[in-house]
């Protein structure tokens, strides 16, 4: 296969990987942790994945400790844990 063909194949595989929905079985385990504001008092707007409602929800993060189920934006939460705007897995 030519190098152009290999590049095209690599590009298509990359695009497919980006667009393939994340199923519930593929979510990182930390997506199932509860929201944890931590112990500090920084009052940072953050988002966590709520596995019961299948939505990314806002919470206030204190800035230290907590757990891995926290994201700086709703979009990053959706990308990582697979929640959609309507709360269904994407």
Curated annotation (Swiss-Prot):
Question: Where in this chain does the record put each BPTI/Kunitz inhibitor domain?
Answer: 31-81
A Pfam family the protein falls into: Kunitz_BPTI
Q: Which residues form a coiled coil?
A: none
Q: Where is this site: Reactive bond for chymotrypsin?
A: 41-42
Cleavable signal peptide: 1-24
Q: Which residues form the propeptide?
A: 85-90
- Name its cellular compartments: Secreted
The GO molecular function terms of this record are:
serine-type endopeptidase inhibitor activity
What keywords are assigned to this protein? Answer: Disulfide bond, Protease inhibitor, Secreted, Serine protease inhibitor, Signal
Disulfide bonds, paired cysteine numbers: 31-81, 40-64, 56-77
Which organs or tissues contain this protein? Expressed by the venom gland.
- Any one annotated GO CC term: extracellular space
Task: Note the superkingdom of the native organism.
Answer: Eukaryota
Please tell me where this protein is predominantly located.
secreted
Q: Which InterPro entries match?
A: Kunitz_BPTI, Kunitz_BPTI_sf, Prtase_inh_Kunz-CS, TFPI/VKTCI-like
The protein's matches in PANTHER family, at most eight in alphabetical order, are given as: KUNITZ-TYPE PROTEASE INHIBITOR-RELATED, SERINE PEPTIDASE INHIBITOR, KUNITZ TYPE, 3
What this chain does, per the entry, is described as: Serine protease inhibitor.
Protein family: Belongs to the venom Kunitz-type family.
- Name-wise, this protein is Kunitz-type serine protease inhibitor B5
């Amino acid at each position: 296969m030519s190098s152009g063909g290999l590049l095209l194949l690599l590009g298509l595989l990359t695009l497919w990987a980006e667009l393939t929905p994340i199923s519930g079985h593929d979510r990182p385990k930390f997506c199932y942790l509860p929201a944890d504001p931590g112990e500090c008092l920084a009052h940072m707007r953050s988002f966590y994945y709520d596995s019961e409602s299948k939505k990314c929800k806002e919470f206030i993060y204190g800035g230290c400790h907590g757990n891995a189920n926290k994201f700086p934006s709703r979009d990053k939460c959706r990308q990582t844990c697979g929640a959609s705007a309507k709360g269904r897995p994407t």
